[in-house]
């Protein structure tokens, strides 16, 4: 999705980031976007398209380094960028490498990235410094 400027009444665009839970559609976070030049919001996740076999969940997201489905605890990655193609590519790439390497990569590349992962049965968030500095709702 790409938004530009603000709504007709002057208020920012509100975009929901979905809570990464299978079989449910709930909001994890609301972003309020009002960048004059426009911004794309792209999210990749492992929580919608998957199958389970032998007690293991296998995602439709494949790690290009192994050719196998990703199996780490990162569930969702959202990237904000002016270019929708780059935002989409980066959200998938960061999801492939997991939250630790993804966070390092997001920082080194100056990406506005939000990571949602599972830890001890709870959903946790982390974000790049560029995302936390972006003009969005917390």
Annotated model-derived regions:
Residues 1-138:
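Mature catalytic core of soluble alpha/beta enzymes
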């Amino acid at each position: 999705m790409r938004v530009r400027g603000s709504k007709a009444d002057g208020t920012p665009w509100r975009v929901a980031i979905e809570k990464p839970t299978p079989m449910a559609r709930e909001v994890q976070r609301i972003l309020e976007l009002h960048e004059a030049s426009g911004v794309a919001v792209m999210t990749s996740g492992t929580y919608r398209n998957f199958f389970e076999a032998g007690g293991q969940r296998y995602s439709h997201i494949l790690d290009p380094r192994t050719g196998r489905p990703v199996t780490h605890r990162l569930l969702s990655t959202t990237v904000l960028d002016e270019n929708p193609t780059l935002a989409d590519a980066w959200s998938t790439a960061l999801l492939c490498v997991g939250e630790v390497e993804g966070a390092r990569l997001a920082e080194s590349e100056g990406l506005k990235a939000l990571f949602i992962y599972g830890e001890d049965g709870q959903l946790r968030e982390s974000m790049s410094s560029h995302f936390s500095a972006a003009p969005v709702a917390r």
